[in-house]
Amino acid sequence: IYTMNDTLSLHDALPICRSPQQMFGAVIREYYRNPEINQGKKLVSVSIMPCTAKKEEILRPESMTNGRQDVDYVLTTTEVASMIRKSGIRFENIDGESTDMPFGIGSGGGVIFGVTGGVTEAVLRRLQTGHSRVEMDRIRTSGVRGDDGLKELTFDYMGKEIRAAVVNGLGNADKLIKRIHSGEVSYDFVEVMACRRGCIMGGGQPVGAGPRTRKARAKGLYDTDVNMQIKKSNENPMVLALYEGLLKGKTHQLLHRNLGVTEN
């Protein structure tokens, strides 16, 4: 959204894929179009996000499918926490439940999206042929992790050297954009997180987080990733089933931004 609003000269460099929120919203809405599944009930899609910008994203024309919002409402994690407290809900008194199927299986690559460098790390995993510990460790230690405002790394893909940059914080993004425009640097892939340290420190997260909390949030995502058997999206059986079923012939319509509309 920031690039679309403030640096239109880079608009053509943006990927055509939607954000995870918008992809999932479109898939959910398509899934529940089936009368046997919706059983005559009206679908209301609510997204819980650490990012306040997601509230605007659902209203943007290019984020809609056939002119309709795929996600109806966005609540931040802070708003949801407040609602839980006011409702008197005590998690220690609630029995745990498994996630709903068929959308309850995720990958470690998806989990680490929430920390700076996570998107790039997920891409690097996807480009590998397997997910042995050696391969995962090599990616993890490639320089993609850490809190630095700008990280640069290179990796080999099919005999070609790929240059990537990972930047977090819009101030750092502005500096990098100027360097790219001047010709000082050139990259094949750039990851930008608007918030320092990524989504774990998003504008919708609880405020006042100190260094210990920031580190704990990142560690929580990385620890979850370690314990997940599926490390990348193309190994997720639910994702593969979606492409063979619900998404067949609808990939562009449901997963890509609607570039045929006029942006305000």
Describe the residue ranges of each PLM region:
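Short, exposed "boundary/linker" segments that immediately precede the start
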Residues: 1-7
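Iron-sulfur-associated redox domains of electron-transfer enzymes in respiratory
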Residues: 8-264
